[in-house]
C-alpha cells in the first residue's frame, strides 16, 4: 500500500527502499498529516492508486469502466476481458476476484458481514470517507459518485493536474476534454464533471503562482503552461490544503 501510494520507493531499480519526498512531506517528523487525519492526504493516496496504469484494477475501474453503476461481477469480467485482450498470461479468475474485493473494500463501507471478516479486514479504509463509491440496491450493487468534491482541495487538484500532464503530454497546452475524460486524468480519477473542472481551473493561476493559466479563447477551453513546474514544486502545492499545520509552523 505504501509503495502504491507513492509514500515509499519500492527499490525496483536497485535502490534501497526508503520514504519518498512526498512521504516525508505528509508523514515525516514535521509532516503535514502524520496520523492521516486530513482528507487531503486521502485524496493524494487515492490519486496515486488510481491515476497510474500500474495498479490495473484501480486504474481500470476509474478510467475505463463504461458505467457509473456496477456490481462485483461487472468489474471481474471487465478485468478478465482486459487481460485476454492484452494477452496477459496466467491471469486467474480467483486472483482477479480477490483484487476486486480489495478494491471495493478500499472505497465502500458495505462489503460482507462482520462475522466473515478478519481483524485486519474489519478496519475501514480511510478512502471510504471520500465518498467516491456508494453501495446501492442489491447486495453487490455499487455506484460511483460523480460531481463536486467538497473535501478535495485546490492544492491537491493542482498537484494531480501537473502529475497527469507530465505523463500525458509535453505540449504547453492541455485541453479541458483531456483533463475531464482521458484515462488517468483528474476528471476521471476524482469523478469530476466538466462544470466542476472549469470552476477549479478558473483559479489555477493563483494556486500555481502564475505557472498555469486557464483560457477560453475562441471557444477553446484549455490550460496554458506559462513556465515549467518541477515534480518537487508540484508536490509543494498540496501545502495549500493543510492550512492549520502551515500556520502553526509559520508562527
What are these regions (language model features)?
Residues 1-251:
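Donor-sugar nucleotide-binding helix/loop cap in glycosyltransferases
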Amino acid at each position: 500500500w505504501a509503495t502504491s501510494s507513492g509514500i515509499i520507493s519500492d527499490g525496483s531499480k536497485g535502490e534501497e527502499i526508503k520514504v519518498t519526498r512526498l512521504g516525508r512531506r505528509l508523514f515525516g517528523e514535521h509532516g503535514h498529516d502524520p496520523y492521516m487525519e486530513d482528507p487531503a492526504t486521502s485524496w493524494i493516496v487515492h490519486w496515486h492508486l488510481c491515476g497510474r496504469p500500474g495498479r490495473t484494477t484501480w486504474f481500470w475501474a476509474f478510467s475505463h469502466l463504461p458505467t457509473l453503476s456496477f456490481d462485483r461481477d461487472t468489474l471481474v469480467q471487465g478485468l478478465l476481458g482486459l487481460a485476454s485482450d492484452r494477452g496477459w498470461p496466467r491471469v486467474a479468475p480467483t486472483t482477479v476476484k480477490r483484487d476486486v474485493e480489495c478494491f471495493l473494500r478500499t472505497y465502500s463501507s458495505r462489503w460482507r458481514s462482520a462475522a466473515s471478516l478478519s481483524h485486519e479486514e474489519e478496519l475501514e479504509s480511510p478512502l471510504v470517507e471520500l465518498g467516491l463509491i456508494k453501495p446501492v440496491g442489491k447486495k453487490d450493487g455499487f455506484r460511483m459518485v460523480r460531481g463536486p468534491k467538497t473535501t478535495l482541495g485546490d492544492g491537491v487538484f493542482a498537484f494531480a493536474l501537473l502529475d497527469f500532464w507530465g505523463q500525458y503530454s509535453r505540449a504547453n497546452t492541455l485541453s479541458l476534454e483531456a483533463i475531464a475524460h482521458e484515462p488517468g486524468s483528474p476528471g476521471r480519477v476524482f469523478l469530476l464533471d466538466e462544470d466542476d473542472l472549469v470552476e477549479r481551473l478558473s483559479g489555477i493561476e493563483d494556486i500555481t503562482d502564475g505557472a498555469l493559466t486557464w483560457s477560453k479563447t475562441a471557444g477553446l477551453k484549455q490550460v496554458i503552461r506559462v513556465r515549467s513546474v518541477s515534480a518537487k514544486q508540484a508536490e509543494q502545492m498540496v501545502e495549500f490544503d493543510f492550512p492549520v499545520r502551515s500556520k502553526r509552523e509559520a508562527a
